Amino acid sequence: MVDVNRFKSMQITLASPSKVRSWSYGEVKKPETINYRTLKPEREGLFDEVIFGPTKDWECACGKYKRIRYKGIICDRCGVEVTRAKVRRERMGHIELKAPVSHIWYFKGIPSRMGLTLDMSPRALEEVIYFAAYVVIDPMDTPLEPKSLLTEREYREKLQEYGYGSFVAKMGAEAIQDLLKRVDLDAEIAVLKEELKSATGQKRVKAVRRLDVLDAFKKSGNKPEWMVLNILPVIPPDLRPMVQLDGGRFAASDLNDLYRRVINRNNRLARLLELNAPGIIVQNEKRMLQEAVDALIDNGRRGRPITGPGSRPLKSLSHMLKGKQGRFRQNLLGKRVDFSGRSVIAVGPTLKMYQCGVPREMAIELFKPFVMREIVARDLAGNVKAAKRMVERGDERIWDILEEVIKEHPVLLNRAPTLHRLGIQAFEPVLIDGKALRLHPLVCEAYNADFDGDQMAIHVPLSEEAQAEARLLMLAAEHILNPKDGKPVVTPSQDMVLGNYYLTMEDAGREGEGMIFKDHDEAVMAYQNGYVHLHTRVGIAVDSMPNKPWTEEQKHKIMVTTVGKILFNDIMPEDLPYLIEPNNANLTEKTPDKYFLEPGQDIQAVIDNLEINIPFKKKNLGNIIAETFKRFRTTETSAFLDRLKDLGYYHSTLAGLTVGIADIPVIDNKAEIIDAAHHRVEDINKAFRRGLMTEEDRYVAVTTTWREAKEALEKRLIETQDPKNPIVMMMDSGARGNISNFSQLAGMRGLMAAPNGRIMELPILSNFREGLSVLEMFFSTHGARKGMTDTALKTADSGYLTRRLVDVAQDVIIREDDCGTDRGLTITAITDGKEVTETLEERLIGRYTKKSIKHPETGEILVGADTLITEDMAAKVVKAGVEEVTIRSVFTCNTRHGVCRHCYGINLATGDAVEVGEAVGTIAAQSIGEPGTQLTMRTFHTGGVASNTDITQGLPRIQEIFEARNPKGEAVITEVKGEVVAIEEDSSTRTKKVFVKGQTGEGEYVVPFTARMKVEVGDEVARGAALTEGSIQPKRLLEVRDTLSVETYLLAEVQKVYRSQGVEIGDKHVEVMVRQMLRKVRVMDPGDTDLLPGTLMDISDFTDANKDIVISGGIPATSRPVLMGITKASLETNSFLSAASFQETTRVLTDAAIRGKKDHLLGLKENVIIGKIIPAGTGMARYRNIEPLAVNEVEIIEGTPVDAEVTEVSTPTTED
């Protein structure tokens, strides 16, 4: 066998008859499988041991030779080779077909490859292959056209007319094979190339397609006649097994049935030919053989599929590869693995961040081999078998051994669906009682896990390397930041937030206010003995906390704080300022000076002058974590997070917050607000009855009135709320619930959507405290049901989107340090109308500059060229008033099959510059796909008469962008740069005309009457600018402008959708995806190159082809960029393995085989499929080919002690 990690590429071609014979170990002549009495395979049948190898290891069929010592001997009695039984998984047989048979993939596929090669229509081919018509092969001296069809009757008439033997016409696949043999590739290609110079329209399209196929045959060395089979390979029997069930019946693979039909028909045909049977009978048998082979290769492709028992279609060879259950996706890309388990998860609040609790029974099963090895090593058992018995008996001594074995051995925990890379993380196992896995509460957010019955899978990394990678790269404590936006993903939630919120509250006039303590311990003691409350504002000597970064003025003073905040600051990293106010200034700069007083000053007066600070909310805790990470990186941050978690749980327990019905306040003037709304609605309806407004206007006015009433109640609720109310505390802290939940409990439920998505005019006036009437309850069920169905549909859509995104970008890896491009991307803030969707500062952080950034007024250089922009630099640039910056971007990167470090910038998951080998394509796809479930499903009605177009939003809009579809509500764009000189309305055609005049010419654009205009007369417009509201069609923009404009537009559009839903995604992720959509060009004029016109090819391949021609002084080819949707881009990838495992498996493989395509295994997917280590991360060539350390041996002379010198030599070598 070839070592899987050694070969560099894999090629697929058509198999020639001689190749099939060379694979085969013998001909299968009989349709028999297994003898039903002896259960032994029949001779010359589909399971024959002579052909395929023995069924038992090292044993021939008759039993003459047994044991391994006869290895390789062929038994003289039964003819079976003595070898391993697993050769039955690799040895093939063959069937010699008595008549040629066409291969259905090449005849039926779209476009029909046989048809294109012969220049015949697929219908004509079908008539010939299935014996409905004759085809003229050689007209000789008759006036017949070659390749013309003759019916049975016409054939006989022509024979009589011209005499027997005056021309050659045949039917069946044999005829097609003869025609294919006669194809002169070089001559045909020359003719087509001539034709292309003058042809236009449909004729040109066809010529390009034919040329493509013929050229593929010529370049690959495949012969066209191999598309017709004379010999059929039989796949190894263990890949189409037959097993005995309990009841003595057999379960067999469908392929055996399909092969049996082929063999039966082939044998019958052989007999008929021997007997010289009448032509019509032989013809019929040949047709049936053709149909049998078609069904074997791709059942159901032509006509009705062949069915088995219960009219179930049989699974043919093609079906074995296709779809989610096919070979690619079921067995090659997603295998089940050993050393794994799954169980329900429960919360483990006492665990450290890098730990997880594993039940004892589970651990002993998972680590069994390790425990057994240790048992034998300690001489507790004589051999492995005894050790295994010991473990299975549950001997007391195994538990201590297990404890030692799992120490320092990380395990992986995974929760399905794994939407992003944080869905699998490594933990150190801790043995626990019970049967549930224990999970640290802070990692729940990354997994999107909760403890209402979720299950998780556990995996054990076995090799030293796997353990090292799990520990260094995947440990949960390392994953503080979310790869999609670089923000902390492990923010505390629920109880932890509530506890810290309660702890940091301040209260005026609580017991012990104004007491001054000498240090932390004294303050805590006073609190524990009831002299002061957690919320009491007290003084504490600054000198008692020498480790905090105080300013010189603040030292030796007394600081006003609360006991709660003293405890809260206890857990903070030492170098952070003492936190009193929940704001950034306090966190990043220093504790505000107003809280300090001189010893002897009146503390009560100072306290009275200070306003009460709001407590620390979830958002503030997130900022503290981000700042801690920025300063101290992972180790300190994860330790701090554990302290924060413990403190939060402890104090939310002590606070003992409860919720009762009395905690939901009653709004005093609710009745008045609702009455006023009723009157207003009555007035609106009156006006409508008088004909003062349209139905649409009335509907909008009524719904607006009720919406305003609900908002008025909400506003009243917020004004009158008591900050100590437990529900308010939960809502305000960000622990649970939001204002809309609160207003449904205490205000009114408001308007509901009907099943058709239109909002009903009758609102629900009650709230949950008062309780709903039966009718109101019924109304509210519509919304609930719609919510459930939407979520279910959205999950599926979002998952499929992620799959397509991953597929198109999986081969984008950081390949080099710097590509040395001379282009950059000029960026500004992204705006949507007047609103800023994404600020310039956000877009700058973590990118490299292309040119240096200068201060717009003073001209001083703020950031040098090719420099990584940090948060502080970005703030400085924006503060200086800079509005646009040229940065290095993925769009302009020149690296082949990937990106370089400088064009990418920082890795958002670590906050450091990205490493070579990082699989940024997959990360980008996950970052865009994972929040997909949070996007809405519906297209919004903008309401009113203002616009007749629905603006697509949410998930459908993202799909529209990435699939490069024509958008709904398309905007009209101008092709001319210049000034809008006139806008005329034409009431007869209900359109408007916009006239744009520029230096290069003028344009006249027809716009629908109802469209909202974006421009006015006198406006300056650029090429490709939208004249009306709506989305621009990207393909149209590409025709008018350049690639970069389209890329920038798509980037902005994606960001608008996500940001409007409150989801932040780093620009670079979208850039990676959009670049993949624009990586191909279509050849327009081949010039002196040997490219074919109309071919789609990678930009890098195109420039290579031109480079050589330009150097030798020829005419280079011209091309134009093509924008492809992600599905199409995935199928057009250079790797046929990746494309075939994505969609349209048979089409991709047919095409690849004709072209004799080579897969250079550059992406991740193709390497996973063949079982090679992926070429990203630690699997990259530059990290793998490291020589072992060479040790110089020093000769030691007896009697004199010598220190041996060890020199380390480590030289990385690269394959390329």
From Swiss-Prot:
Amino acids binding Zn(2+) 1: C60, C62, C75, C78
EC number, UniProt record: 2.7.7.6
An example Gene Ontology biological process: DNA-templated transcription
Broadest EC class assigned to this enzyme: transferase
GO CC, one annotated term: DNA-directed RNA polymerase complex
Residues involved in Zn(2+) 2 binding: C819, C893, C900, C903
Keyword Isomerase: no
Record keywords: DNA-directed RNA polymerase, Magnesium, Metal-binding, Nucleotidyltransferase, Transcription, Transferase, Zinc
Binding annotation for Mg(2+): D450, D452, D454
InterPro entries for the chain: DNA-dir_RpoC_beta_prime, DNA-dir_RpoC_beta_prime_bact, RNA_pol_asu, RNA_pol_N, RNA_pol_Rpb1_1, RNA_pol_Rpb1_3, RNA_pol_Rpb1_3_sf, RNA_pol_Rpb1_4
Cofactor(s) of this protein: Mg(2+); Zn(2+)
Gene3D superfamilies, per database record: 1.10.132.30, 1.10.150.390, 1.10.1790.20, 1.10.40.90, 2.40.40.20, 2.40.50.100, RNA polymerase II, clamp domain, RNA polymerase Rpb1, domain 3
Function: DNA-dependent RNA polymerase catalyzes the transcription of DNA into RNA using the four ribonucleoside triphosphates as substrates.
Subunit structure: The RNAP catalytic core consists of 2 alpha, 1 beta, 1 beta' and 1 omega subunit. When a sigma factor is associated with the core the holoenzyme is formed, which can initiate transcription.
UniProt-recorded name of the protein: DNA-directed RNA polymerase subunit beta'
Chain's gene name: rpoC
